[in-house]
From Swiss-Prot:
Residues 1-26 are annotated as: Disordered. GO terms for biological process: mRNA export from nucleus. This is UAP56-interacting factor. It comes from Mus musculus (Mouse). The modification Phosphoserine is found at residues 23, 60, 117.
Length: 317
């Protein structure tokens, strides 16, 4: 019995308070104000929770665990799905959730805020971050600087941009001028395939400068924004007004199929096989019924058979 008694005494870390002391505490609480009672209860709760927390930390060791969210600051340590590797880099194929603060910055932030009660804590704004979390502010500014530097390095690494004299983006010159003219040519081909005649009018002054400056192939259209597309449809009823057209260049950048062809005065006869019967007669109606028609055909057959057989009877039709 003595052995068991000694073991039990050793196991209990703190002996329970005597019942008289508890009754005295309760009597004191009755005299105290509500705020003082709440503070006392909090202190007692903290004292009871501290040994439990220490045990958990000792037992966990190298286990994978995730800390809870503390007043808007999420701590995410360990090696889980959305966590970091040992060196602090994100593993390939695993994304870090947006707005997560990890590592030393998170520890500092939680350490600073331990003494402040949740009721009195200010909201997380830019000013409060500068005041209460200077480490976080530094980290975000450093990350932004690194991103800007990476973008600049990526731009400089391109060989075609290094060789250029003017640092104009490549897509600007390609897309900006040609978009309108490509649209015109597409529309022209669309209309040409459907039997409409298309004529393009171009600004000659701009074309001369462009032809001298840029070596363009013959089949390519001009790269100016001033290309005007006109579609001509035959309309004899309309009044024709004399239109003054600008003189064209000797070397045009317009495709051959877009140029207006001269209309031939002689009308071509359509090719086809001439019909041997009147097609209108097929649909004409008659007063004769089908029975009458088939009756006549039967009589004609009967006459033929009698004539072939050499019978004495003669049918008059």
């Amino acid at each position: 019995m003595n052995r068991f008694g000694t073991r039990l005494v050793g196991a209990t870390a703190t002996p329970p308070p005597p019942p008289k002391a508890r009754s005295n505490e309760n009597l004191d609480k009755i005299d105290m104000s509500l705020d003082d009672i709440i503070k006392l209860n909090r202190k007692e709760g903290k004292k009871q929770n501290f040994p439990r927390l220490n045990r958990r930390l000792q037992q966990s060791g190298t286990r994978q665990f995730r800390m809870r969210v503390r007043w808007g600051i999420q701590q995410n340590s360990g090696f889980g799905k959305t966590s970091l590797s040992r060196r602090g880099r994100v593993l390939p194929g695993k994304r870090r959730p947006y707005g997560v603060i990890t590592g030393l910055a998170a520890r500092k932030a939680t350490g600073i805020r331990k003494g402040i009660s949740p009721m009195n804590r200010p909201p997380l704004s830019d000013k409060n971050i500068e005041r209460y979390f200077p480490a976080l502010k530094r980290k975000t500014s450093l990350l932004r600087q690194n991103e800007v530097q990476r973008k600049q390095v990526a731009v400089l690494k391109r060989p075609n941009q290094l060789n250029r004299k003017n640092n104009i983006p490549a897509n600007f010159t390609r897309n900006g001028n040609k978009l309108s003219h490509q649209k015109d040519t597409r529309q022209a081909t669309f209309l040409f395939r459907r039997g409409l005649k298309v004529q393009t009018q171009l600004n000659t002054e701009q074309l001369i400068d462009d032809v001298v400056a840029k070596r363009t192939r013959q089949w390519r259209t001009s790269t100016t924004n001033g290309g005007i597309l006109t579609v001509s449809i035959d309309n004899p009823g309309a009044v024709q007004c004399p239109v003054t057209q600008k003189p064209r260049l000797t070397r045009t950048a317009v495709p051959s199929f877009l140029t207006k062809r001269e209309q031939s005065d002689v009308k071509k006869v359509p090719k086809g096989v001439p019909l041997q019967f009147d097609i209108n007669s097929v649909g004409k109606q008659t007063g004769m019924t089908l029975n009458e028609r088939f009756g006549i055909l039967k009589e004609q057959r009967a006459n033929l058979t009698f004539s072939k057989g050499g019978s004495r009877f003669v049918t008059v039709g």
